[in-house]
Amino acid sequence: MIGAAYAQLSAVSYGVGDFVGGVAARRVAALRVMLVSYPIAAVLLGVLAISAGGPVRSGAVLWGSLYGISQAIGVWWFYAALGAGPISVVSPLAAVLNAAVPVAAGVAFGERPGQTACVGVVLAMLAVFLVGRESPDDEDVRTHRFTRKVAWLTIGAGVAFGLDFVLLHQAPVECRLWPLFFARVSATVLVFAVARATGNFQLPSKIPLRLAVAAALLDSCANIAMLMALHAWLLSLASMLISLYPAATVV
């Protein structure tokens, strides 16, 4: 199915993007990485939205903006958790929450996947946890402990990521890529405001800068593929397949 293909493309792009962003966040503050990646993604998605056409409706602005804010918060907290805590714990916990929220929302909205699909969802949930795990590295665990702060950052990031699917799923189909453009614009405004308030309003340089640019390109690809998957498939199934993105991060 075309929805499954889009979901797989989104998962791979998100997974590689998270790895790139996580590496950059271990060199500089997560917000400094996002100061580069988000504006670039906003410009790119704006150009693509104009090319794709489609009307600009209030639903695209509203749901796109809410999605962008939720994703910005999730990425900020996730990068912060990866930078401060053990990846072998942070990644699988965030991934499971990321998968559980949209599945629960889909069922609440009235989606009723078939029996085979339900079994697949359960197995996929287990797979999400397993692929998100890494073999504990003694040095990583010793220098990056799973503190209470890291735990809350991880939980918050997982829930925010899960809400991303739910919010974007509400955007009007006929608006095409416009919800993604408004998402990146709202997220960029939020990131700039928080970065200035926290003293992180400084662009990275050298390797972190290049990694941030790469993360922007991967993020744009992942978002477009996710939007297509959510329009072509059930929320509960598309979100579950996309939630397998930690497999690409680990590989």
Explain the meaning of each model-derived region.
Residues 1-12, 20-21, 25-31, 36-65, ...:
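Membrane-interface interhelical linkers
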Residues 26-33, 77-93, 112, 172-179, ...:
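Structural motif at transmembrane-helix junctions in multi-pass transporters
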Residues 9, 36, 66, 90-94, ...:
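Hydrophobic core positions of alpha-helical segments in small-molecule transporters
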Residues 69-74, 123-134, 186-194, 244-251:
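Alpha-helical transmembrane segments and their membrane-interface exit regions
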Residues 39-45, 93-107, 186-190, 222-226, ...:
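Alpha-helical transmembrane segments of compact multi-pass small-molecule transporters, enriched
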Residues 45-55, 102-117, 159-174, 218-236:
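Hydrophobic alpha-helical transmembrane segments in multi-pass integral membrane proteins
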